[in-house]
């Protein structure tokens, strides 16, 4: 039985962590490729 608090913390942190990784990867991709210069 998983504690509701722990389950809530995990469900709250996982999307934020994935979003942070995606944003950092997207920023490196945009910075690395100067060909696609879109605003």
Curated annotation (Swiss-Prot):
> What is said about its interaction partners and assembly?
The 4 large subunits of the cytochrome b6-f complex are cytochrome b6, subunit IV (17 kDa polypeptide, PetD), cytochrome f and the Rieske protein, while the 4 small subunits are PetG, PetL, PetM and PetN. The complex functions as a dimer.
Which GO terms are recorded in the biological process aspect for this UniProt protein?
A: cytochrome complex assembly; photosynthesis
- What this protein is called in its record is Cytochrome b6-f complex subunit 5
Q: Which family does it belong to?
A: Belongs to the PetG family.
- Quote the cellular component terms of the Gene Ontology held in the record: cytochrome b6f complex; plasma membrane-derived thylakoid membrane
Membrane topology qualifier? Single-pass membrane protein
Species in which this protein is naturally found: Prochlorococcus marinus (strain MIT 9515)
- Which UniProt keyword terms apply here? Electron transport, Membrane, Photosynthesis, Thylakoid, Transmembrane, Transmembrane helix, Transport
Per its database record, what is this protein's job? Component of the cytochrome b6-f complex, which mediates electron transfer between photosystem II (PSII) and photosystem I (PSI), cyclic electron flow around PSI, and state transitions. PetG is required for either the stability or assembly of the cytochrome b6-f complex.
């Amino acid at each position: 039985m998983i504690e509701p608090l722990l389950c809530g913390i995990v469900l709250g942190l996982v999307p934020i962590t994935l979003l942070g990784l995606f944003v950092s990867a997207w920023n490196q991709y945009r910075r690395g490729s100067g060909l696609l210069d879109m605003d």
